[in-house]
């Protein structure tokens, strides 16, 4: 299935689940959508936190298409599920933004680690959340983001359990792709990130960690949602964690070496 066909299936309600494992050669994007009045501060926030918030594209005010991301793409309908935040609280999840869209909304598309999972799988590195049919586990850490204007919050990480040799290879592979979070930020003891229980992720689903495996943590594009909550905007919108926008950008084009 091409990215365009995948977006059509989402647009027409045929697909509503997590997007990991779909359209493997193509990049997926996290979303943050917020009023133009605070868009400059949010752009500075992304620039100050590039590991967690690598930008793939930014829309014009009111535009629900971002040409850099793909053709026949509609931000309002082409994501399986959206989170709506009001005054810093998650108030609803919706399957379309058509009724909520405003002329002052600015779209930020942020790289997603699902994008490099195809390369990991090609190298024979297992992805437990895909194997178990679950959403990838994501955790809010105790690490503060670098603040920009009203935006702060804490770093969020995704976790994939791996054997040591696979973890080393994963570092080598993902280092080539800083536009989708790049190399892991931590391997091993989750307490060093302020994570108390790997079986209780704040976002996504817990997965099995087998004997001899260690947790490998990547900076995650859900991080901006902690910043949106921290800012307590009257309204802000994001993808539901694990439910991404499929783009026409090839993963190969994002490699830096």
UniProtKB/Swiss-Prot annotation:
Disulfide bond annotation, renumbered to this chain: none
Keyword Lyase: yes
Gene Ontology molecular-function annotations: lyase activity
Residues spanning the signal sequence: none
One of the Pfam families matching this protein, by short name: D-Glu_cyclase
E.C. numbers: 4.2.1.-
Keywords of this entry: Lyase
EC top class named in words: lyase
Top-rank lineage group of the source organism: Bacteria
UniProt keyword Lyase present: yes
Family membership: Belongs to the D-glutamate cyclase family.
Protein name: Putative hydro-lyase Bcep18194_B2576
